[in-house]
């Protein structure tokens, strides 16, 4: 992106305090994204869409289509998954329904109204990876090929936007 600018602006936001509380208690969960949605870095900030990268580098990762993403940002979700399939990553970005996870993208959708999808290693049949929220959630469980695939999908998607 620094070498060849895409046709669209790209903002990167890093959220904190996602897992601080419980997802069924909005006053203790995803505090960083909730704060940002109510206090954006630029007054009256708006974006065409958002993509939340959530646990996108694990070995054996599979990304199903999150229900919250489908509800609020279905067009973006389908376009990203089609891009992945066209690049040969259909076994990674699986065309199946995932869970309806309350996560940072939920608050970006609900509170600031920016259509946002969640690319997350979660499927209905397997749930979260076995290393999720354990002391084994460490760098040796990261797969550089999975990270490369996700990066290739996003770069291709972004550079093909008009």
Model regions and ranges:
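Acidic/histidine-rich catalytic neighborhood of metal-dependent amide-processing enzymes
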Residues: 1-75
